[in-house]
Amino acid sequence: MSLPRVGLVVLLLAIATGSLAESANPSAPSRSQSMIDTFQVMCTLELPDFERIAAKATVLRMRPEADSKPSAPGDSGFRSKSWIGNLTTGPFVLLLDETTGPKGKATSCAIVGEVPDLDAFRADAVAAMKLPATPPPEMGNDGSRSFIWDHSFGPGTTLILRDFKPAGKPGIMLKLISAQPLR
């Protein structure tokens, strides 16, 4: 069984197990937990691969939102896709980007959505993904703060948890970037 199929089987089992658990236990997973679970299934079962993640989104019948592949000169290029998904706890957006250049390729997979408590979400994400202590945030000009973990999923990877708490907005983004040098 190929790795993408294994991932889909795991996703379907997680959904089925969750459905069985919900019927036995009326408390559904929290919004934070469902967002973290979705990120782990879509973006971290294997290092981000544009074609495989796009195929997962198609198989899961997620609604395409945007698809762009601007032409670029020479060996460099950029493409991105996004989809809208629905969880029992609310909607989310799946973002997929790939940049190719003379030094290599970087692929990123991200989940974006709203959560009720940004600090609790960050603590839950750190615990669920067994990340080291939360680094100090990098502040953006747009009122965002980004918490960044390098090499958390192996060499050439970066995990970013971004929120807009300083701007008073409830949105979060969990993003895994995998950079691979040219061979």
Predicted regions located by residue number:
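Glycine-rich, aromatic-bearing surface loops/beta-hairpins
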Residues: 144-183
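N-terminal signal peptide c-region/cleavage motif recognized by signal peptidases
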Residues: 16-18
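Bacterial N-terminal signal peptides that target proteins for export
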Residues: 1-8
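N-terminal leader/targeting segments
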Residues: 23-93
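Compositionally biased, proline/threonine/alanine/serine-rich low-complexity intrinsically disordered stretches
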Residues: 21-29, 100-103, 182-183
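Amphipathic, interaction-prone secondary-structure segments
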Residues: 73-100, 149-165
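Long, charged/polar, surface-exposed segments that mediate recognition or autoinhibition
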Residues: 81-146
